[in-house]
Regions:
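Active-site beta->alpha N-cap acidic-glycine motif
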Residues: 1-76
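Short, well-ordered coil/turn segments that N-cap beta-strands
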Residues: 2-6, 50-54, 75-79, 113-118, ...
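Active-site flanking residues adjacent to catalytic metal/cofactor-binding acidic residues
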Residues: 8-10, 82, 142-144
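Conserved, mostly hydrophobic/aromatic
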Residues: 11, 47, 56, 80-83, ...
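Active-site beta-loop-alpha junctions enriched in small/polar residues
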Residues: 11-15, 59-61, 85-87, 122-125, ...
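Acidic-and-aromatic substrate-binding clefts and catalytic sites of carbohydrate-active enzymes
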Residues: 32-37, 55-67, 88-98, 121-129, ...
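An active-site-proximal "capping" alpha-helix that borders the catalytic cofactor pocket
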Residues: 100-109
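Active-site-adjacent pocket scaffolds in enzyme catalytic domains
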Residues: 110-111, 115-193
Length: 193
């Protein structure tokens, strides 16, 4: 049988996505605990069985809260990507807060893997006006937060001007590569709601 190339990614949010929304009661937290305690071992076993590498985008809060599970992901040879600190949307942060989250999470990734993340996925699948500059400044090679294609990588633009009553003016392409995503290919909306 011939080889096939696939790109499999996981957003290993655990409880961080609920904390970011102020949902710290037992119900939401228990939904966040399912990932590290139930889903992660099953997923790692499946990936190991079929010898499939994957990229895991992990918030810094998850790296600190579930260090053993994150070590298991890393030990299995999977890529560890950056996914914010506590899953707060970058557009809701100041430039300084966004940079602090980039730095703080990357420090945890370096502790786990020995090097900074090459890939970034925004917790909200959206970027702030500062995100592209910060990602380039901090040495990221690719982003995986946007949906401008179904599966073909493309270069991220910087400097778009989008106004309600005027035609869009698109900025210049950067060296940052976009690995597009799609809500229709993500399991969260199907299983959570």
């Amino acid at each position: 049988m011939g080889r096939h190339i696939v790109c499999i990614t996981f957003d290993f949010d655990a409880i961080s996505g609920w904390i970011a929304r102020g949902m710290t009661t037992p119900g939401p937290i228990s939904r966040g605990e399912f990932g590290p305690n139930v889903a992660l071992p099953r997923i790692l076993a499946l990936l190991r069985k079929y010898d499939v590498p994957a990229s895991w985008f992990i918030p810094g809060h998850t790296l600190e809260t579930y260090p053993e599970q994150c070590r298991q992901v890393c030990a299995a040879g999977h890529e560890i990507g950056h996914h914010g600190w506590t899953h707060r949307p970058p557009a809701s942060l100041s430039r300084e807060q966004e940079e602090d989250e980039l730095t703080r999470t990357n420090e945890q990734i370096i502790k786990l893997t020995g090097r900074g993340a090459r890939g970034y996925r925004s917790p909200a699948w959206d970027l702030s006006p500062h995100s592209v500059d910060l990602l380039l400044q901090h040495g990221f090679v690719y982003d995986s937060s946007m949906m401008g294609d179904d599966y073909t990588p493309y270069r991220v633009r910087r400097g778009d001007i989008i106004e309600l009553e005027k035609p869009a003016v698109f900025g210049r392409q950067t060296r940052l590569i976009e690995m597009p995503i799609s809500w229709s290919l993500d399991d969260f909306p199907h299983f959570e709601f």
